[in-house]
């Protein structure tokens, strides 16, 4: 049985602008267009979920958005309307949503610390790409999760 592994992380701003996209496995960089497409599809699902008038839950974790072949996408929607999309490849393994929920909350915390840095005056989409704290913390979190 092949254990699950993270495929990509996408972070989108309040207006669905892409703030960050990280393809976890460097060998899959050639699949950038596919992962961008999955991220865009996920944004449509997120917007449908959060704009649903019947939605009663205030939980930021939106859960499983969809499955494309062997890649499952999950989402977290912050109170500032920042969207976190995480894709997991799990061909023969059931991924526990509680694990994904915890992982997305930790990513959200890392993101918050990076963009709320009082010493950084530059809060643009480049903030995450240039933040050493964000990159190192995220890479450590991802490597820990992939080997658990």
UniProtKB/Swiss-Prot annotation:
GO-annotated biological processes: endoplasmic reticulum to Golgi vesicle-mediated transport
Gene3D superfamilies given in the database record: 3.30.450.70
Lineage: superkingdom: Eukaryota
Gene Ontology, cellular component aspect: cytoplasm; cytosol; nucleus; TRAPP complex; TRAPPI protein complex; TRAPPII protein complex
Database matches in InterPro entries: Longin-like_dom_sf, Sedlin
Protein name as catalogued: Uncharacterized protein C15A10.12c
Organism name: Schizosaccharomyces pombe (strain 972 / ATCC 24843)
């Amino acid at each position: 049985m092949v254990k699950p592994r993270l495929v990509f992380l996408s972070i989108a701003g309040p207006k669905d602008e892409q703030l960050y996209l990280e393809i976890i496995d460097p060998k899959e960089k050639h699949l950038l267009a596919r992962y961008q497409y999955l991220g865009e599809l996920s944004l449509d699902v997120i917007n449908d979920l959060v704009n649903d008038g019947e939605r009663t839950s205030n939980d930021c974790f939106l859960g499983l958005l969809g499955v494309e072949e062997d890649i499952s996408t999950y989402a977290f929607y912050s109170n500032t309307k920042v969207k976190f999309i995480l894709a997991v490849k799990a061909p023969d393994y059931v991924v526990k949503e509680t694990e994904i929920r915890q992982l997305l909350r930790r990513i959200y915390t890392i993101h918050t610390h990076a963009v709320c840095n009082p010493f950084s005056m530059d809060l643009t989409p480049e903030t995450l790409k240039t933040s050493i704290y964000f990159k190192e913390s995220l890479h450590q979190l991802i490597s820990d999760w992939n080997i658990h």
